[in-house]
From Swiss-Prot:
This is tRNA uridine(34) hydroxylase. InterPro entries: Rhodanese-like_dom (IPR001763), Rhodanese-like_dom_sf (IPR036873), Rhodanese_C (IPR022111), TrhO (IPR020936), TRHO_N (IPR040503). The keyword Nucleus does not apply. It holds the Pfam family Rhodanese_C. HAMAP family: TrhO.
Length: 315
């Protein structure tokens, strides 16, 4: 293991490690009042350095949001440290991802931010704590057996494309901020309906449920722990899996496979079923897209002939 320690840039603390052993990916978040975020940042940095944790942690006066990788035998030590050190995080949920065939992160970044989630809400009367009803994975699974609800996917369009629950409503968007702007208008005819929301780990649908409550919706619930918690619950109990395809993840793995269902098509030929996201080989472009094996042979991991030709001219 090689370690490049320690740099400090304004509101960031970060370092990088070259791992040779596999790690586990976990995420956790909580909306809560945090007063001394500078102190929190330093304490988190020291424990992460000690436990060789990589990933990203955002902290603000409204809470904490983390997505990290850690060696399996060190997870419990991290949990104990967080719950003992920060009394407002004693009940925080840790989501454990299942697929770590590829290392998710190359460095750790702990950053102070104005908000732990970029939602773009500027209404001063909005209360993020006034959320909809939290559903356990068991309750959520039971509700899916019924037909008296509207199921809303609170993830971006490119996430929905490769995996989602059957009959889930997609709010077409590239960002969560954009999605919130569309949400209320798209669901305005369902105010009397039971609305169930889900996302990857829970933070987006929790915030979205509060925004809906703020806008007069009364029957709003969300999946606590998100798809990650649901998938773990279903696998543990050997129940039929109702999430189809892959979970898009915001790290170097890009996705976790849940079922063998392929829900999308190659973005280039638009014919071949495919759900493998890659980034354009031209780093100046770096577009995220789905490319089948046939288009890969002709375009070689580029999103277009233009990027291919540009790359060749520079190399």
């Amino acid at each position: 293991m090689s370690c490049n320690i320690i740099k400090k840039i304004s509101n960031k603390r970060y370092y990088s490690i070259n791992y040779k052993k596999k790690t586990k990916t976990i995420s956790f978040y909580k909306y809560c009042k945090i007063e001394n975020i500078d102190c929190i940042q330093e304490k988190l940095f020291e424990i992460c350095k000690k436990l060789e944790i990589l990933g990203r942690i955002y902290i603000s006066y409204e809470g904490i949001n983390a997505h990290i990788s850690i060696k399996k035998h060190k997870i419990e030590e991290l949990k104990i440290f967080i719950k003992k050190t920060f009394d407002y995080l004693t009940d925080i949920r840790f989501n454990l991802y299942s697929d770590n065939k590829k290392q998710p992160f190359k460095k750790l970044k702990i950053k102070k931010k104005l908000n732990i989630l970029n939602c773009g809400i500027k209404d001063c009367s909005f209360d993020i704590k006034n959320t909809g009803h939290k559903l356990t994975a068991n309750d959520f699974n039971a509700i899916l057996m019924k037909n008296d609800f509207i199921l809303v996917d609170m993830r971006n369009s490119y996430e929905y494309e490769i995996g989602h629950f059957e009959n889930a409503l997609k709010i077409s968007s590239k960002t969560f901020r954009q999605q919130l702007k569309l949400l209320i208008n798209n669901l305005k005819f369902y105010k009397s309906k039971n609305i169930i929301m889900y996302c990857t780990g829970g933070i987006r649908c929790e915030a979205a449920s509060a925004w809906m409550m703020h806008n007069g919706f009364k029957y709003v619930s969300f999946l606590d722990g998100g798809i990650i918690e649901y998938v773990n619950f279903i696998k543990k109990n050997n129940y039929p899996m109702k999430f189809l395809g892959k979970i898009f993840v915001f790290d170097d793995r890009l996705y976790e496979k849940v079922t063998s269902d392929v829900l999308s098509l190659c973005h280039q030929c638009k014919i071949q079923p495919c759900d493998n996201y890659i980034n354009c080989k031209n780093k100046k472009c770096n577009s995220l897209f789905i490319q089948c094996i046939y288009c890969n042979k002709t375009l070689n991991e580029f999103c277009s002939n233009f990027c291919n030709e540009y790359y060749q001219s520079k190399n």
